[in-house]
Amino acid sequence: MKILQINSVCGIGSTGRIATDLHAILLSQGQQSTIAYGRDAARNCDQTIRIGSKFDNYPHVARTRIFDSHGFGSASATKKLIARIKALNPDVIHLHNLHGYYLHIGLLFDYLKEANKPVVWTLHDCWTFTGHCAHFDYIGCERWRSQCHDCPLKSEYPKSLFLDRSQKNYQQKKALFTGVQKLTIVTPSKWLAGLVKESFLREYPVAVINNGIDLNVFQPTPSDFRQRYNLEDQFILLGVATPWSERKGYQFFLDLAKQLRPDEKIVLVGVSAEQSKALPAGIIGIAKTNSAAELAEIYSTADLFINPTLEEVLGLVNLEALACGTPVVTFNSGGSPECLDANCGLVVERGDLPGLVAAIATVRKVGKAAYSAQCRKRAQDWFDKDARFGEYVELYKAILKS
């Protein structure tokens, strides 16, 4: 098989690493694999197509900020990509994030409909079936069900400073993204699959393939983290996000800090320099790290991982914590609860701070050691990247066979 993946980035960020992990599995099985990507430098992949350049990205950003016309820039770069696709002639075209200031979705989907090749589209958020935003559930917006308009998230990614074009964007996306003859949608969670089936994409078959992680990297890992941060006698509550925002639950950590016991400490990884300066007593802020090995050390050291997300498609950070033997407490939001069972953590109703405090007390009373083996087993049974991304290979084969 010859597979072409298309994503905004390659080898960086969660979706970029998913693409390169899948690329590696395809190569290990003797298949041909190429990744086309739109921004930054490619990592962990030697067979790539760069879509445009930063000089294509910048006008697309401007178009988005001024006209709220995200996904309708980068025309020249997209035409060149289509020429490369024709020359490559892949058996399956696998789409990931098409947002990110690098593609003209109109040109791409006109080509996909004309080419009539099998297409797999992994949705990593909700941008595909809205008129603007990538996430809407955390504010309770329901406009996407019928037609977006008067977008309450116009100032969120992909940010528009002036115009609200959400109604027109919705109409154009619906026209472009429907009617593709051989398209299969994949979502990382049952939650997102449910939304897809209620959207204008409902005509397509939807498969759920959970994200996977590298269990050789994310595993219980000893370190001197406690000593370096003077936390030897502290119960460590860990949070990881990049960037920290309202949706990621940043405010809940600030509120939680006011209710800590004297021997409890919050560690937040991924805080900005500005956020770090404003953190209250009780919270240690650490900048974003691109080192998975360093993250594994921090996950392993923590007594409890807290994910008070208001909306998450699945929650890669949950999986990483579990794989390192650390129990997880998360809100009942999005696909985040799908990561857990009762043996490796607790689920609290979204926004319930007293419930969060009670869950922390419950885990602390039982002790991390009572959870660790089951946390690791949960990750091994359900979120091993080789097994999960191997499901994509089987999906490709089934699609081509049919």
List the predicted regions and their residue ranges.
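Short hydrophobic beta-strand element within catalytic cores of glycosyltransferases
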Residues: 327-330
